[in-house]
From Swiss-Prot:
Homohexamer. It comes from Leptospira interrogans serogroup Icterohaemorrhagiae serovar Lai (strain 56601). This is RNA-binding protein Hfq. Keywords: RNA-binding, Stress response. The gene is hfq. Belongs to the Hfq family.
Length: 85
């Protein structure tokens, strides 16, 4: 991964490392619930009840984590530094 990850990669990587449950809504409205096993630029591997699904990102509408994921962004860091300085 590059030095500067995008928000999508940060969210998915945090969910994967912390083994968080996600609900992924597809464009047709179908919800998929599970944990992220792996992901790349085009797909997400989701594990649900000891089964794995390969989900294409272009078919995803919304991703909702079971709990709030704190994302680190350069913009947030710059805003914090400006407030302190």
């Amino acid at each position: 991964m590059s030095a500067k990850n995008n928000i999508q990669d940060q969210l998915l990587n945090t969910a994967r490392k912390d083994k968080l449950d996600l609900t992924i809504y597809l464009l047709n409205g179908v919800p998929l619930k599970g944990k992220v096993v792996s992901f790349d630029n085009f797909t997400i591997v989701l594990e649900q009840e000891n089964k794995q699904s390969l989900v294409y990102k272009h078919a995803i509408s919304t991703i909702i984590p079971a709990k709030i994921i704190k994302l680190y962004t350069e913009e947030a860091k710059d805003n914090k530094d400006a407030a302190q300085g």
